[in-house]
A protein has these predicted regions:
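A short acidic/glycine-rich loop-to-helix N-cap element
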Residues: 102-114
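Long, continuous compositionally biased terminal/linker segments
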Residues: 38-66
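A short small-residue
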Residues: 96-102
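Short, internal acidic amphipathic alpha-helical interface segments
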Residues: 55-96
Length: 148
């Protein structure tokens, strides 16, 4: 196979994207850690690269105090998420998206889209997730636009 026929390497494409954008990140093999900030919220994002697949995990900063309510909220948010899913991991609510890289010419675009969607969903649901982690219920605002 010629090099252009091979699927892109997710770790190398993500590294190039982050370096080009000027984002600060830490790399440990095929795992990348970076901080995101939007709408006054800050959180950690972890990307795991598995060949041509890049998994993006946005980790909400609130510790879960009420596990049952947090799981209910994850289920509720998952019913509306277009791409990706919410789950509970180590007392944190996490939103996972992914980018499957098939062509080199669009690899960085796909990774950027997965990162942007992850950040948009997490920031648009920030207050609901923080409340849900504490066992509280915030009503959904039907006028609030958001991916989830």
């Amino acid at each position: 196979m010629k090099e252009f026929d091979l699927p892109p390497d997710g770790a190398e494409e993500l590294r190039a994207l982050l370096e080009h954008s000027g984002a600060a990140f830490q790399r440990e093999g095929n795992r990348f850690r970076l901080r995101f900030a939007s709408r006054g919220c800050q959180w950690q994002t972890v990307c795991d690269c598995q060949g041509s697949l890049v998994l993006v995990y946005g980790i909400h900063s609130a510790r879960v105090a009420q596990r049952e309510r947090a799981l209910e909220l994850c289920s509720e948010l998952n019913s509306r998420a277009v791409r990706g899913s919410f789950f509970l991991q180590e007392e944190r609510i996490v939103f996972r998206t992914s980018a499957q890289l098939t062509e080199r010419f669009e690899a960085r675009e796909r990774i950027a889209a997965a990162l942007e969607y992850n950040a948009a969903v997490l920031s648009s649901q920030w207050e609901r997730i923080a409340a849900g982690a504490q066992g509280l219920v915030l009503p959904r605002n039907p006028n609030t636009a958001g991916p989830a």
